[in-house]
A protein has these predicted regions:
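Ferredoxin-like alpha/beta domains used as RNA- or RNAP-binding modules
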Residues: 1-107, 134-208
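Glycine- and Gly-Pro-enriched alpha-helical subdomains that act as flexible
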Residues: 123-127, 131-133
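Short, well-ordered loop/turn sites that connect or cap secondary structure elements
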Residues: 119-120, 139
Length: 208
């Protein structure tokens, strides 16, 4: 599978917002977005004006990078959202928010979505008592997400959850640190998405 290598802080600076790609570092004064509020590259301080196409593209890239998706993965999710009823943009955000790697990040299983994805593929996470190794697995109400039944997994997850003990949970998730566990109690709503993104611009871009 293709993957991106290289400095991820450049991605946050390119989009002009914190995408929380480096975990706890993004919440400190060392965050590149806070220290250098301009895009990467030569003459980057001259942030030019974007065309309508450019604005739509930036919104799409911002959403992709926030959830750590490749273009093909993003297109598949968009196609699924488009097939459903209701607002396509909101349906897309709900699908991405329900991804197992994103849920594990919100619960505090690991400091970043990238680390959560690695935890899942290495078999450290279970859903309803069964090991799940697919980061794109979509959770549903009633699902119990917890470390796989091994001391190593529980120790890893519990340590990270204690570091994020003060994190506020959205209304559709509940968690306990002892034992380390999260429960899906509902479906995510548009208000639960913390990323400042204009999903309608993404729909317009992908519908061309």
């Amino acid at each position: 599978m293709a993957r991106r290598i290289g400095p991820v802080c450049r991605l946050c600076r390119r989009e002009g917002v914190k995408l929380f790609l480096k975990g706890s570092r993004c919440e400190t004064a060392k965050c590149s977005v806070s220290r250098r509020e301009y895009p990467p590259g030569m003459h980057s301080w001259k942030r030019g004006k974007f065309s309508e196409y450019g604005i739509q593209l930036r919104e799409k890239q911002k959403l992709k990078r926030f959830y750590g998706l490749l273009e093909k993965q993003f297109r598949l999710n968009f196609a699924e959202a488009e097939r459903g009823k209701g607002n396509t943009g909101e349906a897309l955000l709900v699908l991405l928010e329900r991804r197992l790697d994103n849920v594990c990040y919100i619960l505090g299983f690991a400091p970043s979505r990238v680390t959560c994805r690695q935890f899942i593929t290495h078999g450290h996470v279970s859903v309803n008592g069964r090991r799940v190794t697919i980061p794109s697995y979509l959770v549903k109400p009633g699902d119990a997400v917890e470390p796989y039944n091994s001391d190593k997994s529980k120790k890893l997850v519990k340590g990270f959850m204690e570091q994020s003990a003060e994190r506020r949970m959205p209304a559709w998730l509940e968690r306990s640190i002892e034992p380390p566990k999260g429960t899906v109690v509902g479906m995510p709503a548009r208000d639960n998405i913390s990323l400042p993104v204009q999903e309608q611009l993404i729909v317009e871009f992908c519908s061309k």
